Amino acid sequence: MPSLKDLKNRIASVKATQKITKAMKMVAAAKLRRAQEAAEAARPYSQRMGAVLANITAAVSDADGAPLLMTGTGKSDVHLLVVCTAERGLCGGFNSQIARFARDHVRKLLAEGKTVKIFTVGKKGYDILRREYASLIIERKELRDVKRVGFENADALGKRIIEMFEAGEFDVCTLFYSEFKSVISQVPTGLQLIPASAPAVVEEDAAHKGAVYEYEPDAASILADLIPRNISVQIFRALLENVAGEMGSKMSAMDNATRNAGEMINKLTLSYNRQRQAQITKELIEIISGAEAL
C-alpha cells in the first residue's frame, strides 16, 4: 500500500498533468476554429475547379492531344499512395485511422499483384507505416517547421508528384487524408490524383445551366495548365482538412484526458483521506491504550 507521502506526490503529479491537458485543449480549440474556417473556405473553390475540369474533360475526352496527366499511361501496374497525416501525436486515433485506411488499400493492391510505392506527408504517418511497409516508402515529407499550411506547401508536393509521374515512376497516384466533418468525426478519404479522373458532375446554378462554352486557344491546352494546378488545389484542401481534423481530435482527446485526470485525483484523494483517517484512528487508540495502562 502506498504511503501518505507517495499518495500526496501522485496527486500533485496528476494535478500538474491536468493543467497541461486543459491548456492543450484550449489551444487546440483556438486553432480548430481557424483551421475549420480555412478548410470550409477551400471547399467551394476546390469543388468549382472540379466542375470546370469535368466540363473541359468532356470536351476533349474523345479528342487527340489530351494531356498525359488526364489519360494516364494506359496501365495501372504501379501505384503511388500519398498518405497525409499530422506531424505530432496526442490527437486520439486521428493518425492511426488514416494509416489504417491506407494500409488496407496497400494490402488490396498487393493482393491484386500491383506494385505499391508510398509517399508519406507528416511524421506520424511515416512512423506508423514504416513498421510494416518500410521497403515501400520511397519518399517522405515533413511540415514540422510550417506554422500555417499554405498553398505553396501543397504546390511543392504537387510538382514533386508530377515530376515523379513524368519520370515514369508510377501509373496511378491516390491521395489519402482525413475529411473533417465535426470535432468528433473525421472520415478517412482516398482521392485519385493521377490520372486526373473527371470529378462527379456538380449541379450548375441557374445562371450557368445550359451554357455553351468555348475554349481559347483550345480545351486540351487549357487542361494541360489546369490539371497540375488542380492537383495542387486538391492537395491543399486535403492538408487543410487534415489540420482541422487533427485539432478537433486533439481537443477531444485533451478533454477526455482532463476529465480522466479529475476522476483519478478524486480517487487518489479519497484513498489519501481514508488512509490518513485510519492512521489518526490508530494513533488515538495507541494514546488511549497508553493512558489506561498508567
Curated annotation (Swiss-Prot):
Q: Record's InterPro entries?
A: ATP_synth_F1_ATPase_gsu, ATP_synth_F1_gsu, ATP_synth_F1_gsu_CS
Q: How does it sit in the membrane?
A: Peripheral membrane protein
Instruction: Name the Pfam families for this protein.
Output: ATP-synt
Q: Which family does it belong to?
A: Belongs to the ATPase gamma chain family.
Spell out the protein name for this chain: ATP synthase gamma chain
- Subunit organization: F-type ATPases have 2 components, CF(1) - the catalytic core - and CF(0) - the membrane proton channel. CF(1) has five subunits: alpha(3), beta(3), gamma(1), delta(1), epsilon(1). CF(0) has three main subunits: a, b and c.
Task: List the molecular function annotations (GO) for this entry.
Answer: ATP binding; proton-transporting ATP synthase activity, rotational mechanism
Major location (coarse): membrane
Q: Which UniProt keywords apply?
A: ATP synthesis, Cell inner membrane, Cell membrane, CF(1), Hydrogen ion transport, Ion transport, Membrane, Transport
Q: Which domain of life does this protein belong to?
A: Bacteria
Protein's UniProt keywords contain Transport: yes
Q: Summarize the protein's role.
A: Produces ATP from ADP in the presence of a proton gradient across the membrane. The gamma chain is believed to be important in regulating ATPase activity and the flow of protons through the CF(0) complex.
Q: Which GO terms describe its cellular component?
A: plasma membrane; proton-transporting ATP synthase complex
Q: Tell me one GO biological process term.
A: proton motive force-driven plasma membrane ATP synthesis
Q: Kindly list the residue ranges recorded as spanning the membrane.
A: none
* Keyword Membrane applies: yes
Q: Where in the cell is it found?
A: Cell inner membrane
